[in-house]
Amino acid sequence: MKWKALFTAAILQAQLPITEAQSFGLLDPKLCYLLDGILFIYGVILTALFLRVKFSRSADAPAYQQGQNQLYNELNLGRREEYDVLDKRRGRDPEMGGKPRRKNPQEGLYNELQKDKMAEAYSEIGMKGERRRGKGHDGLYQGLSTATKDTYDALHMQALPPR
């Protein structure tokens, strides 16, 4: 009995819809235009507020004075460079424990190549002599284990027929 009632209710719901979207007026074009207008005004207001905050920050930045008691101060390089030498006036090297740095007049930022010395060492690349061990094809297949080498030696390579 329950199955008959359930089956009848399912068929009635499929054939006779209870509500439609038209009954609420959601497909009315006037309502869509109204909602589009509201979203457009909302977007314009948000864009105006964002631009006001963005451009007012750059004008307010000099108003903040950096003091000694402030927790976070902006980096002020002043007359220092990005890679400045520490303790420049005394010429001490912090990597050597503060000992004075020896200045070598020949030591520059870049050393030039000395072609005459380089030419002697690399003027000619010598060739190593060929090593021949065992049969003639050992040079092709190096590093074979003894079992694999025996199998290789037992097989004879045949020449390919000409094309």
Swiss-Prot record:
**Region span, Disordered:** 83-111
Q: What is the lineage of its organism?
A: Eukaryota, Metazoa, Chordata, Craniata, Vertebrata
An example of a GO molecular function for this protein is:
transmembrane signaling receptor activity
Q: Which UniProt keywords apply?
A: Adaptive immunity, Cell membrane, Disulfide bond, Immunity, Membrane, Phosphoprotein, Receptor, Repeat, Signal, Transmembrane, Transmembrane helix
Q: Name one Pfam family in it.
A: ITAM
Family designation: Belongs to the CD3Z/FCER1G family.
Chief localization class?
membrane
TM region positions: 31-51
The places in or outside the cell where this protein is found are: Cell membrane
Tell me yes or no: is Cytoplasm among this UniProt entry's keywords: no
Q: What is this protein called?
A: T-cell surface glycoprotein CD3 zeta chain
Q: Name one GO cellular component term.
A: Fc-gamma receptor III complex
For the modification Phosphotyrosine, the affected residues are Y64, Y72, Y83, Y110, Y122, Y141, Y152
What is the protein's species of origin? Sus scrofa (Pig)
Would you indicate the residue range of the signal peptide?
A: 1-21
Binding partners and assembly:
The TCR-CD3 complex is composed of a CD3D/CD3E and a CD3G/CD3E heterodimers that preferentially associate with TCRalpha and TCRbeta, respectively, to form TCRalpha/CD3E/CD3G and TCRbeta/CD3G/CD3E trimers. In turn, the hexamer interacts with CD3Z homodimer to form the TCR-CD3 complex. Alternatively, TCRalpha and TCRbeta can be replaced by TCRgamma and TCRdelta. Interacts with SLA. Interacts with TRAT1. Interacts with DOCK2. Interacts with SLA2. Interacts with SHB. Interacts with ZAP70. Interacts (tyrosine phosphorylated) with SHC1 (via SH2 domain). Interacts with PTPRC.
UniProt PTM comment: Phosphorylated on Tyr residues after T-cell receptor triggering by LCK in association with CD4/CD8.
Q: Which residues lie on this side of the membrane: Cytoplasmic?
A: 52-163
Q: What is known of its domains?
A: The ITAM domains mediate interaction with SHB.
Membrane topology term reads: Single-pass type I membrane protein
| Domain of life of the source | Eukaryota
Tell me the GO BP annotations in alphabetical order. Answer: adaptive immune response; T cell receptor signaling pathway
Q: Which residues does this entry mark as bearing Phosphoserine? A: S58
